[in-house]
């Protein structure tokens, strides 16, 4: 059975269980030493060292609260299992994606709009969380913490040596690719053997060429993917003219290695790939720019998503202690500890350093010209990454038409219940007017 269908089943169990047990099972209990225990479960095992440092500093400075932060492997599976058993942590730390949407839809999170720190979050990231709500809800249910960005990585030394300039429009981008190609250098490396890599340029193009609430508009029946994704599909295929021969024979690691060795001038992938690239070439001078998807620079949008955010469980018995933890986590010094370890962009307004590799994206970050990854709204069982790869492999004259038609039909198939729910809500709102 598909993962999302499983969780929808769990949501019904959770709703019944909460009604029957009064939201029992939360971790905020008194310890033997009299301190209130607050448990945070994070889905990022790669950040365990940063969280260990933060946990230690918190416990050294608080006499009445003991903080435990765990970052297990397979955290999402563990969390879903715990939710079924009604053994809830106090706070969970997850990304702004479809899992957040499902948990919120299951009514697991408490409204934290009365937390002062919410007022210090960059508006773009608050908007992203709102767009992840299946049905609009009053309140705020997550505290965005750290974000990532995806566009096009480029070899800064190669650009400088050849006098190439970072493009700001689609025309400038294709002209640059032609110039690089004529110089004997490969403009792009794609590495589409691993299907998930197809989503990197797809998302980066889509945020600039479509509205950020496209998926919700489709659910409401106001548009179709065949209409809105047409320019995205066209420009995805255009990338193939500037990439390695048969990109489906090379995976993510191959692409990172090739780019690290100077075999391509650019790599359309997120900043998360930089550590892998630098493991091959530690001295590589890497930059990253916003995908110039449009004919006018002013229409471009940076693809940025919430990599980590904190939500207080509705089952939490000690909201005051949970808030004290969130306040500490949102202190500038604490945020910097996390960013120094994990990189990325602070979701909080303030004077936080932007990684040098993302410097070209600074104007977009500082001016909130950002939109979430489209695939954060896609159900996993729809396998959009594989659909994109299949489309790109298809050389028939009507390949794009078939792809977009399938996108619409599969969307209805895998989102039937959600579409009905959204349209019922829409009708209720219209009837109430």
Where are the predicted features?
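A structural signal for short loop-to-beta-strand junctions that line the ligand-binding cleft
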Residues: 81-82, 89-90, 119-157, 186-190, ...
């Amino acid at each position: 059975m598909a993962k999302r269908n499983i969780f929808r089943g769990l949501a019904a169990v959770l709703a019944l269980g909460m009604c029957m047990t009064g939201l029992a099972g939360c971790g905020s209990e008194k310890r033997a030493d009299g301190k209130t225990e607050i448990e945070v479960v994070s889905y990022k095992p790669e950040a365990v060292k940063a969280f260990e440092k933060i946990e230690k500093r918190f416990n050294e400075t608080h006499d009445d609260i003991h903080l435990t932060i765990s970052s297990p492997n397979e955290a999402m599976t563990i969390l879903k299992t715990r939710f079924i058993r009604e053994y809830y942590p106090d706070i969970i730390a997850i990304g702004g994606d479809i899992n957040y949407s499902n948990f919120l839809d299951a009514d697991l999170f408490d409204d934290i709009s009365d937390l002062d720190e919410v007022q210090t979050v960059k508006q773009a990231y608050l908007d992203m969380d709102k767009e992840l709500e299946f049905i609009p809800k009053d309140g705020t249910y997550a505290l965005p913490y750290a974000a990532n960005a995806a566009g096009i990585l480029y070899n800064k030394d190669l650009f400088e040596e050849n006098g190439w300039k970072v493009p700001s429009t689609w025309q400038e981008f294709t002209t640059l690719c032609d110039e690089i190609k004529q110089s004997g250098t490969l403009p792009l490396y794609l590495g589409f053997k691993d299907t998930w890599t197809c989503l990197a340029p797809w998302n980066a193009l889509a945020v600039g060429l479509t509205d950020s609430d496209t998926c919700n508009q489709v659910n409401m029946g106001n548009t179709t993917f065949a209409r809105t994704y047409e320019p995205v599909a066209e420009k995805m295929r255009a990338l193939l003219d500037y990439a390695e021969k048969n990109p489906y024979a090379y995976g993510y690691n191959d692409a990172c290695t090739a780019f690290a060795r100077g075999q391509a001038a650019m790599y359309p992938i997120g900043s998360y790939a930089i550590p892998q690239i630098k493991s091959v070439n530690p001295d590589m001078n890497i930059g990253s720019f916003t995908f110039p998807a449009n004919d006018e620079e002013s229409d471009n949008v940076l693809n940025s998503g919430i990599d980590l955010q904190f939500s207080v469980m509705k089952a939490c018995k000690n909201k005051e202690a949970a808030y004290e933890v969130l306040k500490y986590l949102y202190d500038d010094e604490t945020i910097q500890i996390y960013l120094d370890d994990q990189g990325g962009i602070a979701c909080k307004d303030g004077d936080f350093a932007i990684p040098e590799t993302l410097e070209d994206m600074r104007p977009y970050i500082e001016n909130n010209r950002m939109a979430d990854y489209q695939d954060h709204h896609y159900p996993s069982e729809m396998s959009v990454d594989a659909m994109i790869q299949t489309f790109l492999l298809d050389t028939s004259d009507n390949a794009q038409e078939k792809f977009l038609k399938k996108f619409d039909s599969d969307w209805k198939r895998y989102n039937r219940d959600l579409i009905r729910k959204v349209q019922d809500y829409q009708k209720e709102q219209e009837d109430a007017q």
